[in-house]
């Protein structure tokens, strides 16, 4: 079984800063759009992770990744957001460092948030995480891009090369959230990882006046006087005054 939901490829997407890219800030039906790139070494399960998030299914047979862009809708704090998830080809590491194509760099620049995936069965993919995080932040100078680190294949303990605690420590050092998942066995942690990113991006996208509005909305406003209530109180006061005069 194969899932191919190719919306467009990285190369076809509008360049950041262009008018076309600005038009893509809103998804279908005018919903706010959250763009997420999933990156990591080859064979760590990036495509399987994306498909799990999209369909809650594990599909073990995939065509070679051509940079597919997937979409779905997610409820975040009562608001329906349009989510675009960009799957990417595996990153290679050479003696001089990361080997990132311009297409991949463009994908990272395009994204509002990034999921960095490594496999607990591949120590080199774990070592790549720190370099990849640094590369992501360099492509977003002046702003700290939300990033989640995901350790995949948690079910393959018999061949693990990376203790999950190392992933947690690394993510903490990088200032990222961390999730250990088994894409083949569970979809809850996968969904939570994406949900955290969507929530963080959603908060960053709020207009400057919105946070204040949200804070003040938590404080009960004094109710405006109700005219019917005022009339009722006035009649009660008047009746009491009349009774007092009559008794005298």
From Swiss-Prot:
Pfam family, one: Ras
Gene3D superfamilies according to UniProt: P-loop containing nucleotide triphosphate hydrolases (3.40.50.300)
Catalytic activity: GTP + H2O = GDP + phosphate + H(+)
Xref: InterPro entries: P-loop_NTPase, Ras-related_GTPase, Small_GTP-bd, Small_GTPase
GO terms assigned for molecular function: G protein activity; GTP binding; transforming growth factor beta receptor binding
Keywords annotated in UniProt: GTP-binding, Hydrolase, Nucleotide-binding
Residue ranges of the TM segments: none
The UniProt record lists the keyword Nucleotide-binding: yes
Region (Disordered): 205-229
EC number(s) stated in the UniProt entry for this protein: 3.6.5.2
GO BP terms, alphabetized: negative regulation of transforming growth factor beta receptor signaling pathway
Signal peptide range in chain numbering: none
Chain segments carrying region Small GTPase-like: 29-246
Coiled-coil ranges (or none): none
Keyword field contains Nucleotide-binding: yes
SUPFAM superfamilies membership: P-loop containing nucleoside triphosphate hydrolases
CDD domains: RERG_RasL11_like (cd04146)
Binding annotation for GTP: 40-47, 87-91, 152-155
Similarity remark: Belongs to the small GTPase superfamily. Ras family.
UniProt name for this protein: Ras-like protein family member 11B
Species this protein is from: Bos taurus
Organism taxonomic ancestry: Eukaryota, Metazoa, Chordata, Craniata, Vertebrata
């Amino acid at each position: 079984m194969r899932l191919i939901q190719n919306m467009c490829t990285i190369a076809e997407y509008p360049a950041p800063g262009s008018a076309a890219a600005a038009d893509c800030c809103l998804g279908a039906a005018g919903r706010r759009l959250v763009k997420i790139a999933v990156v990591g070494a080859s064979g760590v399960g990036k495509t399987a992770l994306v498909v799990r998030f999209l369909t809650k299914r594990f599909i073990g047979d995939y065509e070679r990744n051509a940079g597919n862009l997937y979409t779905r809708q997610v409820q975040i704090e009562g608001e329906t957001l349009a989510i675009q998830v960009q799957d990417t080809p595996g990153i290679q590491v050479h003696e001089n460092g990361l080997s990132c194509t311009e297409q991949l760099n463009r994908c990272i620049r395009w994204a509002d948030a990034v999921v960095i995936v490594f496999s607990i069965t591949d120590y080199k993919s774990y070592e790549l995480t720190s370099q990849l995080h640094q590369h992501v932040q360099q492509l977003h100078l002046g702003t700290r891009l939300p990033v989640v680190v995901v350790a995949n294949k948690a079910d393959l303990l018999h061949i693990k090369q990376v203790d999950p605690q190392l992933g947690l420590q690394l993510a903490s050092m990088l200032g990222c959230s961390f999730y250990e998942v088994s894409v083949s066995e569970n979809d809850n942690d996968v969904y939570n990882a994406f949900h955290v990113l969507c929530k963080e991006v959603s908060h960053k996208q709020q207009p400057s006046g919105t946070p204040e509005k949200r804070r003040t909305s938590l404080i009960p406003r004094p109710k405006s006087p109700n005219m019917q209530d005022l009339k009722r109180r006035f009649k009660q006061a008047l009746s009491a005054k009349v009774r007092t005069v009559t008794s005298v």
